[in-house]
């Protein structure tokens, strides 16, 4: 159902370019450090509703031209904050959490390191992450109309063929998460989706 070419959720893993990510949790002084060629996919593996779980106004990316540079920067963070490691939040899947890259009470220092690296080595600092994500989602906004229509059609088929009561299905959660993400990024979804999809979103 969610063909990558049709989905409004961007995928863009590049061969050489990589990103170091620093992701503070919204509700506690805890953050995740790592690197990825596809930061959005990484966000989604950490939490399906990453846009509410992480603080997008304090999160940031460091863009590098090579994976080697990304690994080096990640290693610097790991070594600098070694004495401030913290367990991953329970809501983060074990397979996605990592074992040594969650830290408590280090956001200001992590941001200072990033700004120094950008100034001294020319890396691109994407801060806040919200702006980077908004630009990325706007690039794919034109795909949202057809994708959301397909999703709602499948949801309605499920609804009429599944006994009630029932919990929200995987398809319902996927559609709501996608629309909530656009909304969180201050992208007006009403003109981007069919009227029945917008009505479903507001009523469910």
Where do the language-model regions lie?
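Non-catalytic accessory segments flanking enzymatic or RNA/DNA-binding domains
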Residues: 1-204
């Amino acid at each position: 159902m969610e063909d990558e070419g049709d989905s409004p959720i961007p995928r863009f893993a590049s061969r050489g370019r990589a990103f170091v990510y620093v992701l503070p949790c919204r509700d506690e002084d805890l953050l995740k450090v790592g690197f990825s060629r596809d930061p959005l996919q990484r966000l989604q593996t950490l939490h399906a509703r990453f846009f509410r779980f992480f603080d997008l106004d304090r999160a940031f990316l460091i863009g590098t031209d090579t994976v080697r540079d990304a690994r080096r920067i990640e290693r610097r963070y790991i070594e600098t904050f070694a004495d401030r490691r913290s367990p991953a939040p329970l809501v983060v899947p074990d397979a996605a959490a990592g074992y040594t890259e969650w830290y408590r009470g280090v956001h200001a220092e992590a941001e200072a390191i990033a700004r120094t690296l950008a100034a001294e080595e020319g890396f691109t600092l994407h801060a806040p992450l919200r702006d980077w994500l908004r630009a990325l989602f706007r690039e794919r906004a034109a795909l949202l109309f057809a994708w959301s229509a397909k999703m709602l059609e499948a949801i309605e088929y499920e609804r009429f063929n599944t006994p009630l009561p029932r919990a929200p299905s995987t398809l319902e959660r996927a559609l709501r998460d996608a629309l909530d993400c656009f909304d969180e990024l201050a992208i007006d979804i009403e003109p981007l989706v069919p009227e029945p999809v917008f009505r479903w979103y507001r009523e469910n």
